Amino acid sequence: MKKIDRRKAIKNLTIGLGGATLLSSPLSGFAHTKNNSKTIPSREFGNPNIENPVTVITLGAGGRGNVYGNYGIQFPKELDIVGVAEPISIRNERYTKKHNISEENRFDTWEHVFDRPKFADAVIISTPDNLHYGPCMKALEMGYDVLLEKPIAPSEKECLDILNLANKTGRIVAVCHVLRYAPYFIKLREMIQSGSIGKLISIQHLEPIEHIHMSHSYVRGNWHNSKKTTPIILAKSCHDLDILRWMIGKPCKSIAAYGSLKWFKKENAPEGSTNRCSDGCAVEATCPYSALKIYNDPNGWSSVFDLPDD
């Protein structure tokens, strides 16, 4: 059976991991339609037919870093995690043990990874949104291919810098817009492009963020303040913007956006509420956003925490 080269394997692997490639030049392994949109080649997961797995360093061993790491556990012939950079010690230790990473390839910050000569094929960047730009630019400079969590970066300039450097170096930057690979959206795009449901005039789109997810991520969580991290239109709805553009298949002529904080404000707090749910809040028992219920339930959101094994 014919073996495929590792460069092509990396390009194909980004599809399995859910990456939309950020390169202006066509990539081998993709078919192109008349409007130059890329279609997904069929492939069997777990059977890449390469001599050695693609070696990868994970920058950020949180939820997303572990999702991609688990792919390596499930398909070790495709992906081998050989390094990790993670400042939270319990995450670093668990990820190192899980993937049998050598001590010399453990780092407490992404910068230290690049103090070493290149020692893997690619890096997975699953750091917080405002820590995408630095490691991505450095990885490209050193010749790594990159699997980059969405959004690409907080600013237009940073996004363009990454695009330009990817083109200059010829390296792969695969952005994790995973909805492009969901059967639902693939079929919907096919119907729109074929005209089988008629001519597209307008789209009414709703991002239905579930209420607990909303309170966890965008009220209490890492994205609670748009001045400290990316706003919700990037942190969450970059998926929506990408999938709409992809399904329509035409460039945007103009964009307008507006928004503000409406509900989670002090003046809307119910009578008897406290700063924290655990401070004797009078309405905690009936509150749909109660942290005590959300995080104490073993079948709920407790999995988002790095709890000790005991």
Report each predicted region and the residues it spans.
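N-terminal export signals
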Residues: 2, 7-32
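C-terminal segment of N-terminal export signals and the immediately downstream linker at the start
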Residues: 25-63, 70, 74
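Hydrophobic residues in well-ordered beta-strands that form the structural core
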Residues: 58, 125, 148, 173-175, ...
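Predominantly a Rossmann-like dinucleotide-binding segment in NAD(P)-dependent oxidoreductases
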Residues: 62-65, 172, 179-310
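N-terminal Rossmann-fold NAD(P) dinucleotide-binding loop
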Residues: 65-68, 132
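NAD(P)-binding Rossmann-fold cofactor-contacting core
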Residues: 78-96
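Beta-loop-alpha module in the N-terminal Rossmann-like domain of NAD(P)-dependent dehydrogenases
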Residues: 101-165
